[in-house]
């Protein structure tokens, strides 16, 4: 499908292309803002040598401090200082520029954003704690590009999809194990790299450099019950502060609620401000009906309005299904297809007036030792090799050439971001979940979902995540820490004992995928 031709025929759908995106460049597109791919939906700001093109519904904040302009595109709030105002946060962080406090203050932010500063032709930038605001960057024909969407840069610069990426996304096992995303920090174009969460990218006029600023030091694990209880108490306080701050920023926040532990804990954190929230669920397949039923039961108990969205069962029941599909997959980078049921869900929520912002419970998996859960393991070796990363990433038993190429991209990522030098005593498998599964995949997913509504994630705070990584591994695997947080924040909800387990996480599936991991990491080729 020629997307440009189709959108010319459907001007009412043009607004969904690269929706809620941004582009930072030293090239000038001011005369093209009414053409493809902008279609008159973007605004422009100019600071230093750079032009900031931002989708019309996205907030952009700029603060001048000395000779530097600090910027934040998206949203942020600080649960440690109870500050919801991005301009004040820019001042707070920017004044610490060049000191050790700079990144410490940045670590306190919850939100989805790209943050950085500009001075003349130099620019530096990073993304939120888990990269839920996706970002990629690179030099094309002597011009600098930083964007929320790799295909936006590709469309503007007529870039060609990398040959490795073409072969990867057409590989028969590519869609398994967490869906569509790229290894390491690559994108679909050789010219562009993904902005890795926990790293800071700088351009000095001649080239890019990447600095890892987290972790900074060894983590202090909980050794006693008293230390564990203090961690739970502090984590609960920060989560509840986040849930108090969200209604200060949006008029109609809604928690996407299921019977699972992640959103249950989020809902518990809203205790005391339930009158500020609604909840919603959707049913696109049978197993989701169980989640929706439990979500309604929880909401009714605490007198919170709950809405269930029934997703059509057939593609034909959704007008313009094929063009929506093309837009969504292009926004995602054209790095794989979505299932029909997932597309029907997204399109339905795009068309519904669900909320102003969804309070989403992603990123919780980082602190729930998700690699251990997914593979049914109780132990990973402390020093993972590129082959371990590839084996955690995709199933490659049938294509060793593709596997070796993938190994190479993970090796480059580990080296370029200096991950090994900063691991200290952290569990490396947590960083695969944090920086690959979340930063690499979920950031792209969020970029697509923001076509439905804005999204915020109360777990997405580096200081909070680091705090909960102090919890002993057995408690993280069993979700004891989440249950204890929920009990502390809302005893009544805890006493309801509602827990719907992901039906995909069967013991048989875990055994099979773990056997693959063992075999693939031991084969010498």
Model-inferred region functions:
Residues 431-444:
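Core structural elements
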Residues 104, 163-169, 420-431, 477:
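Structural motif
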Residues 521-525:
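Radical SAM enzyme core and accessory elements
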Residues 502-504:
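Short amphipathic alpha-helical segments embedded in low-complexity Lys/Glu-rich regions
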Residues 1-255, 265-309:
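Cysteine-centered catalytic environments shared across enzyme families
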Residues 1-17, 23, 121-124, 132, ...:
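ATP-dependent adenylate-handling active sites, centered on carboxylate activation for C-N bond formation
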Residues 98, 165-166, 491-500:
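Short, surface-exposed acidic
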């Amino acid at each position: 499908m020629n997307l440009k031709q189709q959108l010319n025929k459907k001007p009412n759908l043009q607004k969904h292309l690269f929706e809620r995106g941004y582009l930072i460049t030293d090239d000038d597109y001011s005369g093209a803002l009414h053409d493809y791919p902008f279609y008159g939906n973007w605004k422009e700001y100019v600071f230093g040598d750079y032009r900031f093109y931002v989708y019309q519904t996205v907030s952009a904040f700029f603060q001048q401090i000395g000779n530097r302009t600090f910027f934040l595109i998206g949203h942020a709030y600080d649960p440690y200082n109870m500050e919801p105002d991005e301009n004040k946060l820019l001042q707070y962080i920017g004044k610490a520029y060049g000191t050790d406090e700079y990144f410490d203050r940045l670590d306190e932010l919850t939100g989805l954003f790209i943050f950085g500063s500009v001075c003349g032709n130099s620019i530096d930038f990073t993304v939120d704690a888990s990269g839920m605001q996706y970002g990629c960057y690179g030099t094309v024909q002597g011009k600098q590009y930083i964007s929320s969407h790799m295909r936006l840069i590709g469309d503007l610069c007529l870039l060609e999809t990398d040959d490795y990426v073409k072969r990867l996304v057409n590989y028969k096992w590519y869609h398994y194990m967490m869906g569509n995303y790229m290894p390491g920090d690559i994108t679909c174009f050789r010219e562009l790299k993904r902005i890795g969460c926990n790293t800071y990218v700088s351009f000095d006029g001649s080239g890019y450099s990447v600095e890892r600023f987290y972790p900074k030091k060894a983590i202090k694990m909980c050794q006693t019950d008293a230390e564990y209880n203090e961690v739970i108490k502090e984590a609960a306080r920060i989560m509840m502060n986040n849930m108090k701050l969200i209604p200060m920023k949006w008029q109609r926040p809604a928690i996407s609620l299921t019977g699972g532990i992640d959103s249950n804990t989020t809902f518990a954190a809203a205790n005391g401000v339930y009158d500020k929230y609604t909840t919603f669920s959707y049913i696109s397949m049978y197993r989701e009906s169980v989640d929706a039923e439990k979500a309604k039961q929880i909401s009714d108990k605490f007198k919170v309005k709950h809405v269930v969205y029934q997703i059509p069962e057939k593609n034909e029941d959704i007008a313009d299904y094929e063009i929506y599909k093309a837009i969504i997959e292009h926004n995602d980078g054209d790095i794989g297809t979505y299932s029909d049921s997932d597309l029907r869900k997204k399109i339905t929520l795009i068309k519904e007036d669900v909320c102003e912002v969804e309070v989403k419970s992603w990123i919780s998996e980082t602190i729930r030792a998700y690699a251990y859960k997914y593979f049914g393991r109780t132990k990973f070796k402390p020093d993972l090799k590129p082959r371990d990363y590839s084996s955690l990433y995709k199933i490659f038993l049938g294509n060793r050439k593709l596997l070796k190429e993938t190994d190479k991209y993970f090796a480059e990522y580990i080296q370029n971001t200096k991950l090994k030098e900063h691991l200290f005593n952290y569990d490396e498998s947590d960083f695969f979940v944090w920086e690959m599964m979340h930063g690499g995949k979920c950031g792209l997913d969020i970029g697509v979902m923001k076509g439905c509504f804005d999204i915020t994630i109360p777990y997405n705070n580096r200081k909070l995540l680091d705090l909960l990584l102090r919890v002993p591994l057995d408690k993280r695997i069993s979700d004891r820490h989440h249950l204890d947080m929920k009990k502390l924040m809302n005893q009544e909800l805890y006493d309801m004992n509602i827990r719907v387990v992901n039906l995909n996480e069967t013991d048989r599936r875990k055994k099979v995928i773990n056997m693959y991991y063992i075999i693939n990491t031991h084969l010498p080729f």
